[in-house]
């Protein structure tokens, strides 16, 4: 990329900065949840909605981000994304109640939903085709550093300042990024087809109300009748979308995607698989602090081996899948992640804390292999005219399933625990033990889906071609 103009390199730095902000925010909050709960007068068992409100908003808004960028311009939308994300961070820091914090996190989610896909679109428009891969590697590298720094930085800020600072640090960075975007980024636009607003609203309503219903009386305090009403509304909305999308060439996501068997299996497996694995980044720092008494900073440091394992495995996942095939790799990693989850709880309850970093490193390796394999299996056989739509649907499902996973984890804690965590450490650890065993069971379930994947090892070279675009 050394032969690119200086203006283009600056634009790539702006996109990289956006990737870093978004990835940092997805991990920095987890370590601070117990401190937030204490400050806001809430039970730590109910703080999962701080994560869900952000991730669910990202899932809902993702389908509209690319169309908005083409219609209004990448600079205008990227600038708007940074401003909304920064304002959301400010409102998060100023929140005095859990409900205020949830609304502020949703505003952050609107910005986060536009930042990454619009950033990818910007790179496609400003970089020559032959240098696109190198440019994407450059801008996504900070996005890999974010999860590495997030948990430890969050713990450090909570322990030596307050949880408010995990949001306040975004403000000066966001202001600089917004100004740089206006000054340096070109406002590319493209001719767009008519946006499927009806389909977008039906999907948004379906996803939001079903997730809210899943949280149920334990989290939101809704009556059984209200929960039943939400379920009915959500199911009707999704059924109406299917009817709307049938034989509709302008649908948000064409039903023709599901004619490709590997896409259907991969999408179903990704949805179920990320429900289970989405619980782990939320539950691990909460358990380390509440169940084992770790400090926020110590709990944050314990998450680093998991990220390192994930980053290290990405270098060899292509060879692993090419050697053993998608079906074997996905079944093995799914069952392996379930076993590693139980191993983590066992070593923690036995007091073998020195073993935990190695277990978390192994968890990161297994999870990374499974993620990359799921992504590429889903997209590898799609025809070119459906590849973009399939990738967008996969991105939405990834965010939705993670929000559902965190919701289920919070629900399990509520079922096995009480309104407030007991001062008896033995009781608290029992609550987490039952929750962890339930999580291990849920994590193992997608193996039944992956067992139906065709044994097509000779086609697995596709992973090296599509891996980066799918992640």
Swiss-Prot record:
- This protein's source sits in the domain of life called Bacteria
In the bilayer, the protein is annotated as: Multi-pass membrane protein
List where the protein spans the membrane.
12-32, 49-69, 77-97, 102-124, 138-158, 165-185, 197-217, 225-245, 263-283, 286-306, 342-362, 396-416, 431-451
Q: Name one Pfam family in it.
A: MFS_1
**Keywords tagged on the record:** Cell inner membrane, Cell membrane, Membrane, Transmembrane, Transmembrane helix, Transport
In terms of InterPro entries, this protein maps to: EmrB-like (IPR004638), MFS (IPR011701), MFS_dom (IPR020846), MFS_trans_sf (IPR036259), Multi-R_MdtD (IPR023721)
Residue intervals annotated with topology Cytoplasmic: 33-48, 98-101, 159-164, 218-224, 284-285, 363-395, 452-471
Family, according to the entry, reads as follows: Belongs to the major facilitator superfamily. TCR/Tet family.
Q: What is this protein called?
A: Putative multidrug resistance protein MdtD
Native organism: Escherichia coli O7:K1 (strain IAI39 / ExPEC)
């Amino acid at each position: 990329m050394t032969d690119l103009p200086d203006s283009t390199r600056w634009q790539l730095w702006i996109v990289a900065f956006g990737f870093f902000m978004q990835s940092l925010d997805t991990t920095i909050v987890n370590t601070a949840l117990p401190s937030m709960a204490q400050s806001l007068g809430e039970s730590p068992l109910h703080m999962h909605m701080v994560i869900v409100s952000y991730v669910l908003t990202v899932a809902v808004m993702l389908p509209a981000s690319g169309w908005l960028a083409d219609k209004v311009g990448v600079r205008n939308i990227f600038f708007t994304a940074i401003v909304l994300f920064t304002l959301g961070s400010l409102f998060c820091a100023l929140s005095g109640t859990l409900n205020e914090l949830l609304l502020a996190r949703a505003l952050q989610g609107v910005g986060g939903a536009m930042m990454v896909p619009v950033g990818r679109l910007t790179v496609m428009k400003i970089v020559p085709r032959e240098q696109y891969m190198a440019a994407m590697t450059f801008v996504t590298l900070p996005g890999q550093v974010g999860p590495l720094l997030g948990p430890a930085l969050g713990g450090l800020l909570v322990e030596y300042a307050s949880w408010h600072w995990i949001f306040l640090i975004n403000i000066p960075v966001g202001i600089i990024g917004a100004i740089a975007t206006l000054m340096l980024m070109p406002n590319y636009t493209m001719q767009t087809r008519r946006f499927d607003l009806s389909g977008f609203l039906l999907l948004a309503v379906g996803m939001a109300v079903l997730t809210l219903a899943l949280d149920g009386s334990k989290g939101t305090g809704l009556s059984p009748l209200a929960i039943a009403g939400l379920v009915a509304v959500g199911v009707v909305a999704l059924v109406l979308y299917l009817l709307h999308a049938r034989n509709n060439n302008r649908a948000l996501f064409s039903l023709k995607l599901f004619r490709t068997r590997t896409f259907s299996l991969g999408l179903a497996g990704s949805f179920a698989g990320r429900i289970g694995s989405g619980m782990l980044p939320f539950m691990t720092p909460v358990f380390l602090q509440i169940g084992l008494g770790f400090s926020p900073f110590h709990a944050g440091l314990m998450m680093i081996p998991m990220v390192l394992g994930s980053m290290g495995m990405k270098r060899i996942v292509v060879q692993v899948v090419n050697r053993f095939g998608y079906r074997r790799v996905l079944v093995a990693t799914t069952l392996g992640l379930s076993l590693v989850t139980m191993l983590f709880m066992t070593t923690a309850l036995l007091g073998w804390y020195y073993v935990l970093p190695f277990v978390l490193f192994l968890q990161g390796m297994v999870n990374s292999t499974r993620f990359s394999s799921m992504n590429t299996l889903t997209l590898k056989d799609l025809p070119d005219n459906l590849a973009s739509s399939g990738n967008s649907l996969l991105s939405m499902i990834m965010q939705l399933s993670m929000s559902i996973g965190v919701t289920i984890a919070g629900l399990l804690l509520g079922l096995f625990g009480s309104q407030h965590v007991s001062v008896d450490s033995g009781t608290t650890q029992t609550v987490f033990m039952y929750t962890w065993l339930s999580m291990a069971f849920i994590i193992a379930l997608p193996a039944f889906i992956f067992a139906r994947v065709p044994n097509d090892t000779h086609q697995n070279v596709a992973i090296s071609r599509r891996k980066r675009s799918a992640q």
